[in-house]
From Swiss-Prot:
Species in which this protein is naturally found: Homo sapiens
SUPFAM superfamilies reported for this sequence: LanC-like (SSF158745)
Family: Belongs to the LanC-like protein family.
Transmembrane residue ranges: none
Record-level GO BP terms: carbohydrate metabolic process; peptide modification
Protein name: LanC-like protein 3
GO CC entries: plasma membrane
The organism's place on the tree of life at top rank: Eukaryota
Length: 420
């Protein structure tokens, strides 16, 4: 096997026993140490005069949940919700509040940017969603303030073409806004958008996809582009858009629901040897293929997981399982430890498959990938990180994965649940 993008997986597969060295007593200290390292590496958030604090805070908060300190706030929130770290809960939540408050100030004081105001992973919607979660976890009644700001952004992304680059994908578009609302519904145990708001956003996604498919003469009902590229993967593409529509399928008209299922099946037909190309119409080069959450099987698996959970049709679960097999072969990625295009993102596929099947083989595989993260081979051969604290590219996402490895019955890819 060529290993240009990944390390060779030399691990034996599951033989009936989990790894004793990946128990709570071994992993919890690694989590704590990694969190402390992340907190030490954070950029200054500013202080003193308001203007100076605003400038410094804005710089630290650039990158939204994906690459900024808002993502660290989410990681700390996630850790605080685990009973395994109950003694540190209040400290982590206070740190999370300090970080997310800085990001909220940056949203308020910064230059208004129509392109990112309603963005989930790269802008305001994600910041307000995490602020809501942190405030709620602290027992503060004023969690309704960031929640109100999140709700108000619904009007921003309701127009069909509210973004020139593409209005429907996960990072900055409507799928991301719906995903954030789904996270809030799950964590707060209440719907945060009205049925009318949900229907308006879903209808805009459907209308946009229909219009694009007709304009480009596609032989299938829904298609989208981002900066002119017809992506298929979870980061910017068709799979996560369809995943969000399935997550709100009860709000769709029966005829539109049928278009979504036709599009899901169309995407399933684009599979090439257990993987999908980054964009529609590409042919995968097996020796150099992308096997990432952002582009490829490890991210597209979540659409088919959702399709299986909604429909109970075995072909969707079978597709997920094939995604897992490819990820076991080629998921020890050289791009780092993160969840977007790193080892933790690959390993989350195994935790997803464990929850879908109950097969302990997948916990074992996730344990092996976790073990590999701390080997000299990985440290020496993986790409140097621009930001160790990034939720998606750095160690904050890795911390979320390690926590979930210890509680696999609740495990889910950060901010991307199919179980709601």
């Amino acid at each position: 096997m060529d290993t240009k993008r990944c390390f060779a997986n030399r691990f034996d597969d599951y033989q009936g026993s989990l790894l004793a060295g990946q128990c709570e007593e071994a992993v919890a200290p690694l989590v704590t140490a990694t969190i402390e390292r992340i907190l030490q590496e954070l950029p200054p958030l500013g202080g003193g005069a308001e203007a100076r604090g605003a400038t410094a805070g804005a710089s630290a908060c650039q990158g939204g949940l994906y690459g900024g300190v808002a993502g660290v706030a989410y990681m700390l929130y996630h850790v605080s919700q685990s009973p395994l770290f109950a003694t540190a809960r209040e400290r982590y939540l206070r740190s999370a509040k300090r970080l997310i408050d800085a990001c909220a100030r940056a949203e308020e004081w910064g230059e208004p940017d129509a392109d990112t105001r309603a963005a989930f992973l790269l802008g305001g919607a994600g910041v307000y969603a995490v602020a809501t979660l942190v405030y709620h976890a602290l027992g503060r009644s004023d969690y309704v303030q960031p929640l109100g700001k999140f709700r108000a952004l619904c009007a921003v992304c309701a127009p069909v073409s509210f973004l020139e680059c593409g209005s429907d994908e996960l990072f900055v578009g409507r799928a991301g806004y719906l995903c954030a609302a789904l996270v809030l519904k799950q964590k707060l145990a209440q719907e945060v958008l009205t049925p009318a708001q949900i229907k308006s956003i879903c209808q805009a996604i459907l209308d946009s996809g229909k219009q694009y498919a007709i304009k480009k003469r596609k032989p299938f009902p829904l298609m989208y582009s981002y900066y002119g590229t017809e992506y298929l993967g979870a980061a910017h593409g068709l799979s996560s858009i369809l995943q969000m529509l399935l997550s709100y399928h009860e709000h769709l008209k029966p005829s539109d629901r049928e278009l979504v299922w036709q599009s899901v099946d169309f995407l399933m037909e684009q599979e090439q040897n257990c993987n999908w190309p980054p964009e529609l119409g590409e042919t995968i080069e097996r020796e150099n293929e992308l096997v990432h959450w952002c582009h490829g099987a490890p991210g597209i698996a979540y659409l088919f997981a959702k399709a299986y959970l909604v429909s109970k049709k075995p072909q969707y679960l079978d597709t997920c399982i094939r995604c897992g097999e490819l990820t076991w072969q080629k998921g020890l990625l050289k791009k780092g430890p993160g969840i977007c295009h790193g080892v933790a993102g690959s390993a989350y596929v195994f935790l997803l498959l464990y929850r879908l099947t109950g097969n302990s083989k997948y916990i074992y595989r996730a344990q092996r990938f976790a073990q590999f993260l701390f080997t000299e081979e990985f440290k020496a051969g993986s790409r140097v990180l621009e930001s160790i604290y990034s939720l998606y590219e750095g160690f904050s996402g890795t911390v979320c994965f390690l926590i979930d490895l210890l509680q696999p019955n609740q495990a889910e890819f950060p901010l991307f649940s199919v179980f709601v």
